[in-house]
Regions:
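Acidic, metal-coordinating catalytic segment for phosphate/diphosphate chemistry
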Residues: 2-44, 58
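A short, polar/proline- and glycine-enriched secondary-structure boundary/capping micro-motif
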Residues: 32-37, 61-66, 142-145
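Long hydrophobic alpha-helical segments typical of transmembrane helices together
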Residues: 155-178
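Unchanged
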Residues: 33, 72-163
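Residues embedded in well-ordered beta-strands
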Residues: 34-36, 49-51, 121
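A short, structural micro-pattern
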Residues: 12, 29, 68, 115-116
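Glycine-rich adenosyl-nucleotide cofactor-binding module
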Residues: 46-90
Length: 178
C-alpha cells in the first residue's frame, strides 16, 4: 500500500488510490486498539461490570445542553509509529483510566471497507486494582470524555462496532459459551 498514490493529505489523514483505482482513507497511525476493562461486581463469579469511555464521535454529534453528545466506547486509541498493538493498549488504558494493566488478546477486526485500518481488541480484569490518576493526552476531545462502570450486558446495546464485537467475544470467554 505504500506505493498507492496520495490524492489528499493532512497531518491526520490521507486519501489514497490503489493501482486498481480503489480510493480509501488512511489515518495517521493507521491501526488502533480497543480495550475492555472488567471488574467483578458481586458474589456471583459470573457477574462483571465493564468500563465504558463516553467520548466524542465524528457522526451524529449534536450539542445537548451546550455540550457535545458523547458515545459509549471501550478504551480506544491509535498505535504510535513502531508501537505494538499490545503496548498501545497498555498505554491507552493508563492514559485514559490510570490503570496499570497487562492485557489479554481478544482478536482483531477490519474497521471498514473504505479505510485500511485494523482494530486490535484486548481486555483486562481490574478487580481490586486501584488506578492512578488518568494522564490523558492533552487534547480537548480527550478532556471531555468520561469513564463510567456499567453492567457487562450494557455492551450489547452500544452502537459502536468494537462494543458489539467485544460483547460477543468476551461473553464466550467469561461465561464459557460455545
Amino acid at each position: 500500500m505504500d506505493t498507492d498514490r496520495v490524492i489528499f493529505s493532512t497531518q491526520w489523514i490521507a486519501v489514497r488510490e490503489s493501482s486498481q483505482g480503489f480510493q480509501y482513507l488512511e489515518r495517521n497511525g493507521k491501526d488502533s486498539v480497543a480495550v475492555f476493562l472488567l471488574r467483578k461486581s458481586g458474589e456471583n463469579p459470573a457477574q462483571y461490570d465493564v468500563l465504558i469511555r463516553h467520548q466524542h464521535l465524528c457522526i451524529d454529534n449534536q450539542e445537548v445542553n451546550g455540550r457535545l453528545k458523547l458515545f459509549p466506547c471501550p478504551i480506544t486509541g491509535a498505535l504510535d509509529e513502531g508501537e505494538s498493538s499490545e503496548a498501545a493498549a497498555i498505554r491507552e488504558v493508563f492514559e485514559e483510566t490510570g490503570y496499570r494493566v497487562q492485557v489479554l488478546p481478544l482478536g482483531k477486526y477490519v474497521v471498514g471497507t473504505q479505510v485500511n485500518e485494523v482494530c486490535y481488541l484486548y481486555y483486562a480484569n481490574v478487580t481490586g486494582i486501584v488506578p492512578d490518576e488518568a494522564q490523558e493526552d492533552g487534547t480537548y476531545l480527550e478532556s471531555i470524555g468520561r469513564n463510567e462502570w456499567h453492567p457487562f450486558n450494557y455492551l450489547e446495546m452500544c452502537e459502536y462496532s468494537a462494543c458489539q464485537i467485544g460483547f460477543f467475544k468476551l461473553r464466550k470467554i467469561l461465561f464459557q459459551e460455545s
